[in-house]
């Protein structure tokens, strides 16, 4: 398949710079995967789509204030974006600088540049940075002087309020450099209402890396290599999924990260061996993929030519997805991380759909 098959134009005016004031009052586009039928609702109407006995699964990762601004020894400015914490003193990160970054060079951060670090390695496209002579751990440093890493398409500086807006209300495990944005629409009253209705609620963890913002650079999408991210799916959750399906309930995934985590676990030994699934995954889901776990997906509106729109096409069907996006643009839905959402059911014919290239 050609990358250009997944191109469409989104007016800049539809890119959301801030979320809806009340999380659950964002708009919701509902698409039936089998019929392609579309309905326009508000997010709190999701309560009418999810039934007693269904299992809804969230990604409980928590966003790190992952962006640091500092200086080189020469005085030149640098911007560091955390990819992964390696240990108490070292990180894997991308570095922006006006000039070339050299190995074995120093970087300085914090008040009066008192926090000193040293570039000790390179693992394409990231640098390995070790923080020196600091009593504080890397986590402490980022929590104290880091900035919330808003996506590059939100053309404004991050504000203090983003520290809460760009987190889900159920965040727990610190480790992401981007929010699992489908979950941003859930507030505590909505979660309570789902629970009262008899919907089972559970969690897994996928720590989202900066690779989520990287474009596909191959004309043929099959040649794209996904970045790796750490996933944790408990054995208890796997057994709960099996029991839910056995009883006729549906599995609802909140976000593409949740779906990718579940599919990764499904293809592992953990699925049938009653073991926790804790591994890096680089699963790339695109049209032609047959989904094994999830019956319905809640997701935001994604960038054209992104791995995320390809996942949605694989789940909903290519034609259904393009029609839904056309309808969303026509009706002025808000796009991307702080935008509106979709609720889509699985189209079992999607894996066999022909996409003209």
UniProtKB/Swiss-Prot annotation:
Q: Name one GO biological process term.
A: tRNA wobble guanine modification
GO function terms (MF aspect): S-adenosylmethionine:tRNA ribosyltransferase-isomerase activity
Pathway(s) served: tRNA modification; tRNA-queuosine biosynthesis
Its GO CC terms are:
cytoplasm
User: Where located?
Assistant: Cytoplasm
- InterPro entries on file: QueA, QueA_dom1, QueA_dom2, QueA_sf
Keyword Transit peptide present in the record's keywords: the answer is no
Tell me the Pfam families matching this sequence. Answer: Queuosine_synth
Q: Keyword Hydrolase on this protein?
A: no
Looking at the record's lineage, which domain of life comes first?
Bacteria
This entry's Enzyme Commission designation comes to 2.4.99.17
Which reactions is this enzyme annotated as catalysing? 7-aminomethyl-7-carbaguanosine(34) in tRNA + S-adenosyl-L-methionine = epoxyqueuosine(34) in tRNA + adenine + L-methionine + 2 H(+)
Q: Which enzyme class, named as a word?
A: transferase
Arranged from A to Z, the UniProt key words for this protein are:
Cytoplasm, Queuosine biosynthesis, S-adenosyl-L-methionine, Transferase
Q: Which NCBIfam families has this protein been placed in?
A: PRK00147.1 (NF001140), queA (TIGR00113)
The record's function comment reads: Transfers and isomerizes the ribose moiety from AdoMet to the 7-aminomethyl group of 7-deazaguanine (preQ1-tRNA) to give epoxyqueuosine (oQ-tRNA).
Q: Which family does it belong to?
A: Belongs to the QueA family.
Summarize subunit and interaction data from the UniProt record for this chain. Answer: Monomer.
Can you say what this protein is called?
A: S-adenosylmethionine:tRNA ribosyltransferase-isomerase
Q: Which organism is it from?
A: Buchnera aphidicola subsp. Schizaphis graminum (strain Sg)
Write the lineage as a comma-separated list: Bacteria, Pseudomonadati, Pseudomonadota, Gammaproteobacteria, Enterobacterales
Gene name of this polypeptide: queA
